[in-house]
Each structure stands twice: as structure tokens, then as C-alpha cells.
């Protein structure tokens, strides 16, 4: 906001300017009664972004002050729109009593809402996390990137360190909604979320460490196993300071911090995550994706956990096997216990029970932040009442050690449910300010005040009857509204009968409203009781929150157990419904899939052709040839997704599968220009290939699709050959290498660990039939002519292409492109083709003679234009 001289303003506006200076560049929602008002540039910006009315209030230096506002009751929907636009908002509330204030009522900023610090359900996506992350870069001598990220809506706090070159991939893995970093730091990343800069001193080692020690109330960070991650500790300290400032309080629900180290997860760069369409399609849609297919969770927290699993496949076999065993136990229990649980079976009964639970993970976080709503506590109370039933369902599943551990986590202190059942009304109001939240019988003083207020109804009925009798006014009414309080209403035609002790309170068009000493005395008594009851209720609500805050950690643990049960149940149900199998887990890096299917594509088409794949120490690369539209890309993605599912602990779509330890998955699939970055399709292709060659290992899975197609034939072939050979001899990665260069099929004769496979197709009277079946050996042709015909290319163009192919083959063209135009034409087409060929030869001869007579270096611009028109006439 431009500099404003506050001395000439009213005390209220002076207060606003002080608070706006504190908020800085953030939009300031300044509470004034039933509205949050904005002034100056904030008002103009809000009016533009929110489409609210821009008005004026007072003047500044002779000019009207712009003002815009939003109703308090609708604040959340406006906040959601602003946050979606990447804006941050400071919320300023009235904390003083307007009745007692001699000047402006006391106000202060109570919280700051940013894209990464959301905790309110109305602002958060139900099935995705909105993490806040911080990045710290170390010096040039030993360059490291430290990353800390916090899910404020659950309290999960993590750190990791990586090489600066890996920072972008790590940020895409974490997927934060907001990134915090120092003022002096420059980041070369493709991350596109909100960014917030803070002073450099927030990241200083001593201060950051001290802040963490103070928060966790400990003398050492050794217990968190992060002492050897100094750069990440700097990021964590700065992040915690930033998050606490936005909430204007300590983050009591953030009770631990965990380190994620290299080797825990199968790494995937941003390109791979996008190409595999894990949680978002290539066009940016939420479905159909792997997540949308698998997510049949009954709780939002289960869906969020499943999403995290898909983005964090595990490298080690032990935790993968634990999930696998849990799914197998759920499936076997469904059959073994059908007699006990009826036709639905245990799995379905368990999943139905999970559907009764609210989002306890986020409720626990809001409880710690004192922003939990009364109805959320009521839903928590009702859920805890069903917890024993759920524990009964999980108890028989002890064949899985992991399920047995989850059953233990579900055990909560009965005092939580007892307090909630006694304290919270059966159907509480939306907010504590409305009253009716604390249950009757919980507090004797509150019950007495409520009784006093409730008795007013009987008193008013009796008063109305007495006054009608005393005045003779039969239509006299005693009523109440929030503006004028209690009053006696008399129609205009009866006002001459009004007694002397009636005092006029309000004049209407057809009636007069009065107050009497008796009614005034009762009003004071009742309104005082209502005010005192509400104040008492607010105080009691705070006491309930104080008592419940001691149970935030066990509630969070129970929520985590419920989420995992839900995610495992969803995977089990999908495996049951679609006949997925448990893959064998191997220690070595290999993939062996029998009759595998693409998990997403098979649901989109009527019939899907299963395929095999074997990659191991003796067969490290498959060179894949075959027709366009034959299914090469689908096959490659299918193998990668089955491997990824296996490493998450899920069952997989196959008859049988064996998947070993994989450290990374890379994909080079598809083509798209990077217009913003000024990079062509071919440049993008080479950049991705370079990253694969630099980072893939003998334990990596690499998918390379049509490398080299973005340049000339010779360049493309040479690059494809060299890249394929490098992957075999140097990187030794498990590689699926799809190509249209037929020459590459000679590579297996030189490299024993390479093999040819192709996507089969068959010709029929009606054209080509793509079998989508992977067979051993190279393809004989690509059937490009048939694909072109099916795409609607004109027949004349098809004939012309066929003639050109014949000419090239007659000249011994070095790169036939897999016999792209080798399909035979029928007799009529052959005759027409010969006639066209003869005519074209004559035209080409005339064109050649005309060109030989032109010296382009000696032509003037006008002569060049005339020559061009002569050549055009020869067409």
C-alpha cells in the first residue's frame, strides 16, 4: 500500500493503518461488525478478484478511500477463492468489547491464511494434502539442498536432504502448495506453486536449531535422527517459525519430526509422474488416473494416504510385504468369515464401518489449533461410539502383523468419548457464538441461566393476556426482535386506548410499539441471563477444548490407523473385484510379468489383450517395434505401473508377477514443445534422455519411446543407437526401448542382454487389425499406410507416398522406416498409381530443366519472384 499519513484520519482508520503495516503485502480482512472490510489497494484488489462491490468510506488527502467488504458468515468461501488464486490473507478480529470500548474496539491479527497453511475443511481438498515446504541451500563447497515440509492439517513434519540437482524432483514428489525460502536464495526449479520469501536469518543454523529444540521441548535432536542433516534442520526451523506465525500460536499438534533418507523410496522425476498419470492425466484432469481407479476409500484420510503411497513407492521389500500380507489377510478373511458376517463378509463389513468415521486426522489438528467446530466434535463423539465395533472387526485379522499393530493404535482412552458425550449437545449449533453447543446437564450454572431465559415464553404469554384485559385491545401483541428487544405492539386504530405507563419504542406505518416498566424490567433480566448463558457456554467450550487437547496425539495415531485400514481395504476390494494377484518380491532388480494388463486402460475398453514382460540380468533391454497405434506406449506404461503398484504393496493386474528392488523409474514418452522455456520438441526429448543417462542405474526401470524422431533420419538413428547402447553397456538399466528405426533391431546381435519384441498386427480384407499382442522378434513393417488411411489422409496422398517409397527403395534408401509404405495396393490402385507416376515424371523433368537455368546468386528480388511464378506454373 502506498504511504498514507495516518495523523489526519479517524482513530479507527489509524488503527487499520497500523494493522495493515503489520500485515505487509497480505490482504487484510479487517473485522467491522458483521463484515470484513478492506481499504485502499486491498479493496481494489479484492473487488477485482472476488467480484464484490467497490465503494468508499471517508477521505485521505482529499480523495475518497476505496472500501470493499465480505460478510463474516461467508468469509470461508471468499477465502477459498483467494487462496485458489495464490493470495494470502491476514484475518483481523475484534477482541475487545465494543460496549466497553472508549475508542476503537481492540483488534489484532489472529491468523494468516496462505496456500500452504490451510486447516479449515472448507478450504482444503478432501482427498489431497496441502503441504507447506521450506528449502535451504548450503554453500558452494559442499552443495546440499535441505527440504522440510509440514502438513498443518495433520501435524506430519518431515525433512530430507538431496543434491541441488535433485531438488526439483523432490519438490514434485512432495507436492507442496507453498514454498518458503530465504530472500537471497535463487531457485532454478519448475515448481509452480505459491512462493513466500522470508528474511535470511530465519534459516541461520543456530536460530533454526534453537527454535526446533524449544518447540519439541528437548535438549537434542538426536532422538529424531536428524542430527546429520544440518541443511534440512535449517529449513525445518524456518518452516516451523513461519507456520507458527500464520496461526498466531504454537503448533501443539506438531509433536515429532521424521527424516526421509535416500533409499527409502523409488524415485521418479516430474516427467515420469506426469507420463504415468498417477494422480493427474496428461491434460490436467483428475480422472482417469491410477489414483481415481484405485480410490474406493470410505474416508478422506484413507484417500489421502493412498495418494501418498502411489507417489512414494517403497524400495525395501519388508514394508511392501507387510502391506501385501495385510491385503491378503483381508481377502482371505472375507471368505473364511462369511458365515459370521453374512453374505457381505468381513471385508465389506469393515469398509462399511469405516464409512461412519469423519476426518479425525484434520479434526485432531483443528482441536490443537483451537479452531475445531462444535459439529466436528459431535461427529467425533458419534464416531468414537462405533470404535469398539470396528475393533471387533479388526481383532480376527492378527495373521497380518501390520493389521495387529493397527488394531492396537485404535485403542483410545474412554475418557475422550465420555467427555464428548457429556459436554456436547446432540445437535450443536454451527458456531459457539450461536449458543446451544454445551449439552444440558453438563453445567448447573448454565442450566439455571438457560431455564431463566426459557421461562420468558410463559411470562410473555401471561403478560399479553393481562394487558389485553387491562386495555381492552384484543389484538395487542407482546413480541421480541434483536434490534428493539421486547415490545408491545398496538395497531394505529387502537392507540387511543393505550395506558399512560406505555412508553413509545418504535413507530410503524400501521402500528405503534411500546414498552412498560414491567416489560423493561423483565427484558433486562432475560437478556442479562441470555448474555451470561452465552458467556458461560463459551467459557465451558474452552474448558472442553483444554481437556481434549491432551488427547491430540492418540487421536492422530488412531486417525492414521483408520486411514491405513481404509487404504488397505480399498486395495483389497479392487484386487478382489478385478482378479489382481500378489506379486512375488525379489531382492535383485528384475521384472517378470505373465499376462499383465494396463490397470487404467483395461477399464476404458471392452477387451484388453494381456502381455508378458521379462527383464533381468540376462535380458536388460527390450527393443520394441511395431505399427503406430499398435500399443507400444500402452505396453511400456503398463509394465511401469505394474512395477510401481508392486512397490507400493498393492496386488497387480496380471496372472503372475515377480518384481524386484527398483531404485528409480524414468520415462521418455510423448512429445511437446516447452514454449515458455524456448525449447523445441527435440530439445525436450534430448534433455529428458540426458537426465536418464546421467541418473539411471542397473536397478532402474527406463522407458524410452521413439527417441530421435524429432530430427533428421540420420541424426535420429545415430542418437537412438548410441543412447540404447549406452543404456545397455554403461547404465545397465532395465529398459523398454520403443523405436521406429528398423536398424536398431540389429542391436541384440551385438549386445547379448538386448532382445527384440514387437506389437503384432494382421491384415485382412477390411484393412489392418492391431492385435496389441507382444511377440518375440522384430516387426516386419509399421503399417503406417493403413494408419494414415484410417486417419482420413486423402487417397491421392496415399498413392503419392507409395510411389515415393518405391523410388527410395529402388535407389537403395538407407532408412526404410520399417517399410512404412510397403503395403500392397489392389489392381485398380496399381494401375492408377502407374499413370500418376508417368505424369509426375514428366512434370519433374520440366521442373528440373527450369531449375538448372536459374542462378539464385545473380537474381534481383523482382527476377526471383518472376522465376518463382514460372516454377509454380509447372506444378
UniProtKB/Swiss-Prot annotation:
Binding site for ATP: 626-633
Role noted for this protein: This protein is involved in the repair of mismatches in DNA. It is possible that it carries out the mismatch recognition step. This protein has a weak ATPase activity.
Domain of life per record: Bacteria
The entry's keywords: ATP-binding, DNA damage, DNA repair, DNA-binding, Nucleotide-binding
Biological process according to GO: mismatch repair
Organism: Bordetella avium (strain 197N)
Alphabetized Pfam families for the sequence: MutS_I, MutS_II, MutS_III, MutS_IV, MutS_V
Protein name (database record): DNA mismatch repair protein MutS
Xref: PROSITE patterns: DNA_MISMATCH_REPAIR_2 (PS00486)
Keyword DNA damage assigned: yes
GO cellular component, one term: cytosol
CDD domains with a match to the protein in the record: ABC_MutS1
Assigned protein family: Belongs to the DNA mismatch repair MutS family.
GO MF annotation, one: ATP-dependent DNA damage sensor activity
